Structure formats: C-alpha cells, structure tokens
Amino acid sequence: MTPMPTARGGLGVAVVNGKIYAIGGSSDNLPVNNNEEYDPVTNQWTEKMPTPTARSGFAIAVYNNKIYVIGGTVGNGYIGNNEVYDPATNTWETKASMPTPRSDLTASVVNDKIYLIGGKKYSSTSPYFNETNVNEVYDPANDSWSTKTPIPTAVYGYASAVINGKIYIIGGSMNPSSPGSSVFVNSNQVYDPQTDKWSLAANLPDVATYGAAASTQGFMGPSRLYFIGGYFSNSFSGKTQVYNPDNNSWSTGVSMPTPRAYLGVAVVNDVLYAIGGFDGENWLNANEQYKPVGYGTVPPKVQITSPENKTYSNVTLAFAINRGTEWMGYSLDNQANVTINKETKLLDLSQGAHSIIIYANDSLGNMGSSNTVFFSVDTLAPNIVIMLPQNQSYGSTDIQLTFTVNENATLAYSLDGQEKVTIIGNVTLPALSNGSHRLTVYATDEVGNSGSETVYFNIAPFPTITVAGIVAIITIALAAGYLFLKRRKSSNIQE
C-alpha cells in the first residue's frame, strides 16, 4: 500500500465512507496536526484541513460521519480538547472538552455515545503522570459529558475495540508503586454500556502496550478482535493476536511485516490497515494491509424487510443486503427459485398462507439466505348484511341501523349520498324526512379490502287528517246504528 505522506506515531486513524483519515500524532518527538486521507480503492493519499490543535496520544472516534479528536498530549501537558472534523465540508469545530484532561487512551462508540476510558493524567510527583480509572461518556447529540463506572484496573497505552456492543480494553501499562519503568499488563477488561458493569475476558497471550486493536464485523470475515503490534521490554512487536468472543479464546494471525508500536489500525470492509507508528528508531509512514482470518468465507447477509409475518392484500418483496452479490433469488412456498435484483411485487398470489425465503450468492461462492417469512394473502372484501332497515316503508322517522360484518373492519355509513359517518357498530340514524332514502354501509378490513351494502327504504307516516276522518266515520256509523236500534225498539212497544 502507498505509504502515508507524513511519518508519525501516536496518531489517530478513523474511517468515514470507506476512506481512512490519519490525524495528528508525533514526529521527531514533536506533535503534528497533519490530516491525511487515504482511499483504499485508488491507493492514494490526499491532504486535508489540519487539526486545530497539534497533539499525540489522543482518542479518536467516528459518530454520524464526523470524526471526534479528544484529549491527548501537547508538549509535557495533557488536554481535554474535543475537536470535530467533518469530511464532507473539510472543516473543524470545537465541542465541550473532556472533564478529565488525559492522554494515551481510546474512544469507543456504542449506542450513539462516545466512551473514553482510562489513560494517563497529570501527577504532581515524578514521573508526573499516573494511570487513571476514569470512565467519561460524551453525548454528541447535546454536547455534554457524564461519568460511568470506573475501569477496575486503571491502564494507559492500552488498545480497545467494540464487538457486539461491548468495549474491550486490552493490555496497556501502569506505573509501579515505586519509581522505575512501567508495568505492562495483559488484562482484557470488558465494559457493557447497557448495564454499566465490568467483567474480565481471556487475557492477551503476549503482554504488550501501545499496540492497536480493531474488530471485524462479519462483513467479509468472521467477527473477531485483532490486537496488532505493541511494545514490551524494549522489544517492538509485529504479532497479530486474534480474539474470538464466541468462545472467549485467542489465536495467532499472520504477523505484521513492520514490527512497531504507537500505530493506528483502521478497518474497511473487514480489511485491516496498519498505519504509522514507531519502531524504536524511526517514526514510520508504513501502510500495511491485512486480510484477516477467514476473510472471504463469510456469506452475504440478506434480510427480508417486506413482507412481514402478517396478512396482506398486495405483497411487495423488499430486502436489505450487506454487500454486492453475483446472484439473488427467492423461493415462494418451497417452489423453484426466481431471480431478482431489486424490490419486486409478488403477483397472482392465492388466498391463504404463504412462505418466502431469499438466497444470495457472492463472487467467492458463499451462499447466504434470509430467514423464512410466513405471511397470508387476503383479497376478499368484508361481507356486510344489513338487517335493519329493510327495503320497505316505515311509519316512524326514528330508524335503527342494525348490521353484521364477517371480520374486523373499520365501519362507516352514508345516508342519501352524504359524507361518510364513522361508526363502531349498530346505531340509531338521525331523524329522517318523509320520502325515499338510500343507506350504504362501508367496511374496510385490516389489509385495506373494502366492501359495501346498500338498502333503499321509505318514510311514510299516516297523515293526521286521514286518521281523524276514519274516526269520524266510525263515530257516525255507531251513532246511526244506535238511533236505528232505538227507533226499532220504540216501534215494537207501540205494537
């Protein structure tokens, strides 16, 4: 790989949109502010806007495509400066400083927070610094700091990486109880931000300090943590030590060609790049690429985002995949595979239950598959039966709407073509005018199928004058009958 333009160690490296940014560091024991961008695709370096504060031994992290440069060493002092670089605009801005000024630490991003753990801070007695167990958390969303549970064993010059949402703090140094050289440690301290608790994992096999660590994410290689290089007992290492979180064990990978410490390691598409550093004599501009254990053996990861495990009237097959493929296809109801390369509609599906799975094959022959999704198709409209009113005349203006629907649905009615009125069940209609009326009930089921049913009825109450006339006729008839009977009775008596 093309060497970095500016030889240096104690730098920070970060990846944004597939490009590596090498920032700051130390060269000839002087802090530098260089900011150089490396493009692995073109194997070219480009100068970018320097960091406002030249420093080394700082922590670096990426959040929301911006690079956070925090803390570090300037001369013989430790700082808490928090400067943020935006590659999209090639500009820097300053944010809230870290509460505890310190250096020789790392930054880890978990759940939108940046964790800065341990490191070294100023001491008033020789050697004028001490390791610290501070665990401070920066929230980029509101530019604020908070404190979490301290690391059990305070260290500086360690390496760290994140796997499965946990932060691994590996190796490092601590001052002895009496003046002298530093004590090197091989601990593997694990912090869980979700529980704010610490635990221990398998120790680093070969003790080292000022190495670098990074993790692969299962993109092209298995998810592993890599501890590379470092320094121990006047010896600079090129070892690659590989940690497997699945079984809490270490193994050994291919050694780095240039043994060194104070380097930076970046990961692009599960390929590692070891950049810069110090080999005991020279500040380095080395840029060495490492393809990790099992690289190229991991199948593509594909996930079906639509359909889900529910019922549909129309079905769109949509998916997410983590990298390019040579071929993709789906199998519906265990039938033959159908080739696809983008979102597609599944047409002519029968009523009822279905299953679907997607397969993806990469250029290396690795076949991946999604989970199987079970779903149902329902294209039938709800069936509505109106019991009342019926297609007839009614003498009352107070009408009860009574009906049934054969499935859960959103309900409404419309009277005489007016706007729909939402209801939840049977209801009494508003007072109606005399004459004919049209009533339609609507039902829309949970997947959008709509049905309707209409009845026609008439409001025709008996007129008041008609009733009075009938009563009068009956009264007259009764009176006439009475008089007739009375006269007949009188005639009989006279005879």
State where each predicted segment sits.
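Generic secretory/membrane-interface signal
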Residues: 27, 75, 84, 96-98, ...
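Alpha-helical transmembrane segments
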Residues: 475-486
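Membrane-embedded alpha-helical segments of small multi-pass membrane proteins
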Residues: 470-474
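Low-complexity, disordered linker/stalk regions enriched in Pro/Thr/Ser/Gly
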Residues: 295-469, 486-495
